[in-house]
């Protein structure tokens, strides 16, 4: 196990940047990567949660932790982050997402624009900016968090789901483009996860297939370097197969609406 951790640190270190780090899956990624000895750049909006997370990580692990509290939907702030960062970043984890809930006719256009900014524009920019050094060094990795909502149309979260489909397709294409350059790209196509956001919005807190964040992170890190996508949890893999391969599209969309109609 120790040699695997050392190999992971050598391949994806010395620094990892985690966008959307403050809680849930992002915090679980932070803990798992700290256990593997990577120094961390933590990015999220809420400074108090970031500071609390960083304090705990420093106390439990012999690593460096840098915090940046900023809005990942603000491209000026994101550009400033990249230009001011001089650490050797070997791994990018993009976990941040904006997901307003509501039928398209009821969602303000400003919210739709923010979905594009946070879920598409910023990860594109960060991948482009950070992968150049990874390619030059001949090693590195990118993890994009995606969602089962993006494998078919998802009423009530239609634009968010479309952005997650984009994330998956981008990761798959980049996986092929960059694998021979020793840069590993992976999309985690997750189902329901017990994050603070999910527990607030979901009507059914323990739906079949719901996972804890650390379970999602463990399966994702295990898949990095061996596959373009991973769907944590056997139930979720089965559901993905049924929804994407067996059911007619209209039926899959109706089933998805049954799952999303009670979101708040």
Where are these regions (language model features)?
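Conserved glycine-rich cofactor-binding loop
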Residues: 15, 20-23
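Conserved glycine-rich Rossmann-like NAD(P)H-binding loop of the short-chain dehydrogenase/reductase
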Residues: 36-53
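Conserved NAD(P)H cofactor-binding loop of Rossmann-fold oxidoreductase domains
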Residues: 95-100
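Substrate-binding pocket helix/loop in short-chain dehydrogenase/reductase
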Residues: 103-104, 108-116
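Active-site helix of classical SDR
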Residues: 127, 163
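Residue(s) in the substrate-gating loop at a strand-loop-helix junction
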Residues: 147
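C-terminal helical subdomain
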Residues: 187, 203-241
